[in-house]
Swiss-Prot record:
Species of the source: Oryza sativa subsp. japonica (Rice)
Annotated catalysed reactions: ATP + H2O = ADP + phosphate + H(+)
Name of the gene encoding the protein in the UniProt record: MCM8
One Gene Ontology biological process: DNA recombination
Keywords: ATP-binding, DNA damage, DNA repair, DNA-binding, Helicase, Hydrolase, Meiosis, Metal-binding, Nucleotide-binding, Nucleus, Zinc, Zinc-finger
Family to which this protein belongs: Belongs to the MCM family.
Phylogenetic classification of the source organism: Eukaryota, Viridiplantae, Streptophyta, Embryophyta, Tracheophyta
Its job: Probable DNA helicase that may play a role in DNA repair during meiosis.
Motif (Arginine finger) on chain: 522-525
Gene3D superfamilies assigned: 2.20.28.10, Nucleic acid-binding proteins (2.40.50.140), P-loop containing nucleotide triphosphate hydrolases (3.40.50.300)
Protein name: Probable DNA helicase MCM8
Amino acid sequence: MYDDGPRKGKPGGLSMDAATAAGLAAVWPEYFPEESEFAADGRSARLAADLVDLFSSPDASDLLSRVEDDGDILSLPVDFQQLSNLTWITEALQENPKEALLSMGAAVHLIVCASRDLQLGDINKINIRLYNHTKTIALKNLKAAYIKKLVTVRGTVLKVSTVKPLVLQLNFQCMKCATKFPRVFCDGKFSPPVSCSIQGCKSRTFIPMRSTAKLMDFQKIRIQELASGESHEEGRVPRTIECELTEDLVDCCIPGETVTVTGIVKVLNNYMDVGGGKSKSRNQGLYYLYLEAISVRNSKVHAASGNSDAASGSFGFQAFTEKDLEFISKFKEEHGADVFRQILHSFCPSIYGHELVKAGITLALFGGVQKHSIDQNKVPVRGDIHAVVVGDPGLGKSQLLQAAAAVSPRGIYVCGNTTTNAGLTVAVVKDSMSNDYAFEAGAMVLADRGICCIDEFDKMSAEHQALLEAMEQQCVSVAKAGLVASLSARTSVLAAANPVGGHYDRAKTVNENLKMSAALLSRFDLVFILLDKPDELLDKRVSDHIIALHSNDGGPFTANKRIRTVPQFNASTEFGVGRTSLASRLRLHPEKDKDFCPLPGPLLRKYISYARSHVNPRISMPSPAADSLQKFYLDLRKQSDSADGTPITARQLESLVRLAEARARVDLREEVTLEDAKEVIDIMTESLYDKCVDEHGVVDFARSGGMSNQKQSKKFLRALNEQCDLQKKDCFSMNEMYNLADRISLQVANLDAIVESLNNAGYITKKGSSMYQVVTSSYQGSQATWSRR
């Protein structure tokens, strides 16, 4: 504590030289307006004198050179760690942080004016912005014991108000004797004088002299605790706290950003100083906490100052201790080229199989590299990977998403059937106290630089259009209540959906199974389809896995080791023959990997955060990896070449590059290798196969969008009926049918199969080697209509 005793090591003992005292007396009203006069023997004055001596030393010249000039507002960023060895300063900051910071500002004011040959009145008040202050405190621990203390909290900006002027000081004039009274408003709380202090005048009426008002910029923000923190508690509403920003701190953050706020904890009672009646007796003893911000640090400030970690897409001030860095180094050295398999099986080990699906989600967690994110002259290219898992109920899709949100350094999990459009993107809310409109961030904005997991994706068809911009342009534009803005939403989207009707129908396209537009589906880099196929061998091994998961005898033979004894099934039972290379390499062997132990969640989160923050792989041109990706893309274009257009576009090539960069990030490499490209091609092939295969097992790239064969058959039969009425005949040759299919742009790979299916259904009848009669034509007077499905 800063007491009345002499300072140890302080030059000059208790005395204060006349020059310092005169200088402090001149600037004192600027920093302590509530004090009527400068007291040289006061605690704050002696602290300021000590700080003048400290900052006058040559070691402090570098610190004072950092004074920032933002118009008429001056500020000095001070690293707390540089002052931590000075006990008397840390004790003063702990006992009365407001007084200590103001005294420090007054001392810096004197030194800056002396070093720049300026008069004390030539510059305005200097604000001390203390950062890097001790360990952050969780919002749940912020209670009454911290009132008037200096603390540091971290969270996501949930809401930002408009900037308004706050009155700090105002003169009032008595209506009776015309005497003027200066009035200082502590903490901005407006409190006019009660009665005139002049002898003999008892007037209670005063006129505010608005021209004498001393103002400063004021803004409120609300921050929410980080959902993926290790101290996060499930089953409760995330805690929030309001922070007051003043002067140079206003407009330093936007909704969705992760910020570290250092400030003083204060209390406020909404019913204080309010006239009688019910409001005076209601909740009179209840207060709520808020922060008076001293400094705000966020990724935008770091990126603007040239910090490469922020520019590379870090997860917002993830701290790495020496033990963390040592673990990452040893983990990479121990597993070598097997890191990907180790991380993949550490992710959601309770789900059996689905290695390639887990591989795709793992790559989405690491993400690619965003290009041109800072250069204003170039269009940014997203590096986040989007994936959707479609399949029958009960295959573990929701567990995969919850596991992804849990291990992500910044992950948000939402359910589609309880999510609104505004809750997913951004809402405009009205402040009850100021009647102003402000933005309130939704899930996509809160997950900025992270991952957003959306379950029950098929239940939110009305909100699909809101995701189109957020998934490709990585931002959310809003124009509501007279507010027009664009908020960052640089997030990976992981979605899980059940098909319409509860069971995936191979005869329908992915769009028809999900009721999803082709524009939204094309934005997903990976589309995985999980089918519940009856398989005696697979069912036996899945049941063994589930029983092993639930049977823990309490001995060293834990459930985790018991799971390893379950033999992994052959890929041909799930994925088909001929596509087993990557899946077989990723699969755990029951004998070789019997001692496998998954990586704990906190360590996996640290590894992912480090990779995303410090590893920025690139793909060189020319290189074997680039040539391999380009060749695969060109082969896809050739295979999907058709007259009605193709779903294989440049987006697939960009997806391949993003996946290859993510694969290199897993191994902490700065260069994409040929092996990375091969593994990514295997994953992309699996995704395309699932998306484009039909009910007969035939791969048709046009089936990723558009209509299924059933709807194409309906369209073709309708055209045949129209031709019967126009040409007054009901028999057509195959050549005429081919010409008709071309005219109506029928999107089928095999017209003969369509004709054969219509013949088998009885809608057309074969009359010769290549002649067919239309049975449902109105030309024959038939009243039959197309009613079959």
